[in-house]
């Protein structure tokens, strides 16, 4: 399944979740798009709820189905809770860490920065958004890319960095100090439904 590239606000309203992380999509119209949007949301079956939760998480991180399932299967081989491990693996993607550090305003912007070679991991350029960042690794910006408006503007407005990351705004450099705990990740997601979906 290809990555969704349509209007993110419309998709956010359909899923009932802010994919941009700002919440603006749902402020004025907290209902699904279309002529029947303002009415009650259709009651979903058990399968429908599981599918919707999977779609929420997949679109939140902006990954295609193949990448999503690959990480899900990888999480199954780890010790601990399957669903929590899956969430942690998604959060450790390089594009997501770039976003969480405040170097981009959205995950989509962060993915573009990585794709275009603007991001360094431990001083070396990495242009693979799905790269798994490990605890202790440092994420930075190439010298030639430090004046990009997309980066400067994002850093200026960002006022929150998760506790499992550190960030130096002057150096445009951050460290993935540890793996996040489940309580630090997407409280609006019920990952147990996603595990149930793939266990059918």
From Swiss-Prot:
Keyword Transmembrane recorded: no
Query: Which residues lie within the region annotated Disordered?
Result: 22-42
Write one Gene Ontology MF term.
rRNA binding
Top-rank taxon, per record: Bacteria
* GO CC term, one of those recorded: small ribosomal subunit
* Residue pairs linked by disulfide bridges in the UniProt entry: none
Database matches in InterPro entries: Ribosomal_uS4, Ribosomal_uS4_bac-type, Ribosomal_uS4_CS, Ribosomal_uS4_N, S4_RNA-bd, S4_RNA-bd_sf
Q: Which UniProt keywords apply?
A: Ribonucleoprotein, Ribosomal protein, RNA-binding, rRNA-binding
**What HAMAP family does this protein map onto?**
Ribosomal_uS4_B
PANTHER family with a match to the protein in the record:
30S 40S RIBOSOMAL PROTEIN, SMALL RIBOSOMAL SUBUNIT PROTEIN US4M
Q: What family does this belong to?
A: Belongs to the universal ribosomal protein uS4 family.
The record's subunit annotation is:
Part of the 30S ribosomal subunit. Contacts protein S5. The interaction surface between S4 and S5 is involved in control of translational fidelity.
Put simply, this protein is called Small ribosomal subunit protein uS4
């Amino acid at each position: 399944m290809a990555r969704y590239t349509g209007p993110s606000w419309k998709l956010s309203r359909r899923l009932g979740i802010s994919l941009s992380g700002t919440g603006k999509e749902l402020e004025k119209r907290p209902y699904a798009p279309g002529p029947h949007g303002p009415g009650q949301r259709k009651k979903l079956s058990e399968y429908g709820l599981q599918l919707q939760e999977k779609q929420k998480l997949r679109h939140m991180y902006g990954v295609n189905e193949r990448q999503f399932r690959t990480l899900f299967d990888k999480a199954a081989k780890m010790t601990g809770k399957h669903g929590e491990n899956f969430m942690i693996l998604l959060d450790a993607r390089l594009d997501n860490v770039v976003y969480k550090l405040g170097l981009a305003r959205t995950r989509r912007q962060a993915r573009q920065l990585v794709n275009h070679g603007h991001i360094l991991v431990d001083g070396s350029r990495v242009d693979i958004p799905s790269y798994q960042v490990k605890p202790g690794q440092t994420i930075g910006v190439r010298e030639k890319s430090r004046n990009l408006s997309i980066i400067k503007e994002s850093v200026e407005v960002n006022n929150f960095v998760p506790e499992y990351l550190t960030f130096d705004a002057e150096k445009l450099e951050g460290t993935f100090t540890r793996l996040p705990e489940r309580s630090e990740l997407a409280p609006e997601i019920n990952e147990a439904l996603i595990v149930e979906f793939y266990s059918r």
